[in-house]
């Protein structure tokens, strides 16, 4: 397994945000995390990425205890595309992408030919040439999200985490970038974990699902194991109509 969480909990001022979360995630799978607002999804993501280390229980990423792993070492294993971006300096797109290579270089050493090659290839693949003279600060929210998707690929980690990372994207770029991530799962056997609010978008790309409500995991498994009326009603407190094709859910409607 790539990721293991054992009885993970997290509280703020006595209020439980996560309660005894236990998960085992495998290599080469696309996981969709679903749940209502305030369920604890982003908190779980922050713990997985080592951003929040004030939790109870244990988290292992590729066999390494997250609490005992340095941020630099962890950033060679897992990359993250957040929902919100805070850039207060006029970096160019290439400069932001080059930050994705930082975990791979030694302190006070220059970037290598490979570093520049990786950045150039992804820069061109994403069509960023038109932003050559534009700072990332000047870009729209959706354009910035595309830059950080690209940075996650530049980082070349076996695990990629997306925390509502398509929230500012139109439908074209949402599906284009999620297709890129799906290809990473299929061709490079990477593990992608993505928080979704749109169930139908998740259906298009995910192999497995994690349902979270009130800080607890209410269901895990593949589509057949999770996407049923009972699980969805318990997750969102409402009824759904599930449209199937060839015994597979293709659309879920209220």
Predicted regions and their residues:
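The feature captures the beta-strand-to-loop junction immediately N-terminal to the Walker
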Residues: 34-36
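Conserved ABC ATPase "signature" region
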Residues: 98, 113-131, 156
């Amino acid at each position: 397994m790539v990721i293991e969480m054992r009885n993970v909990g997290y509280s703020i001022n006595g209020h439980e945000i996560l309660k005894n979360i236990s998960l085992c995630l495998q290599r080469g799978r696309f996981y969709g995390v679903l749940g209502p607002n305030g369920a604890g999804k982003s908190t779980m993501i922050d713990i997985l990425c080592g951003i929040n280390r004030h939790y109870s229980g244990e988290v292992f990423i590729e066999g390494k205890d997250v609490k005992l792993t340095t941020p630099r070492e962890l950033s060679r294993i897992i990359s993250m595309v957040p929902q919100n971006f805070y850039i207060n300096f006029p970096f160019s797109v290439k400069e932001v992408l080059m930050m994705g290579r930082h975990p791979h270089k030694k302190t006070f050493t220059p970037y290598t030919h490979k570093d520049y090659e990786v950045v150039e290839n992804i820069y061109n693949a994403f069509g960023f040439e038109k932003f050559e003279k534009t700072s990332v600060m000047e870009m729209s929210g959706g354009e910035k999200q595309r830059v950080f998707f690209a940075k996650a690929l530049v980082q070349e980690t076996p695990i990629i985490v997306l925390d509502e990372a398509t929230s500012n994207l139109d439908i074209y770029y949402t599906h284009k970038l999620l297709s890129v991530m799906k290809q990473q799962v299929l061709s490079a056997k990477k593990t992608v974990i993505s928080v979704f609010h749109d169930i139908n978008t998740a259906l298009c790309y995910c192999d497995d699902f994690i349902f979270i409500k009130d800080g607890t995991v209410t269901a895990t498994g593949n589509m057949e194991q999770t996407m049923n009326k009972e699980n969805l009603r318990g997750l969102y407190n409402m009824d759904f109509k599930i449209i199937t094709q060839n015994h597979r859910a293709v659309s879920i409607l209220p």
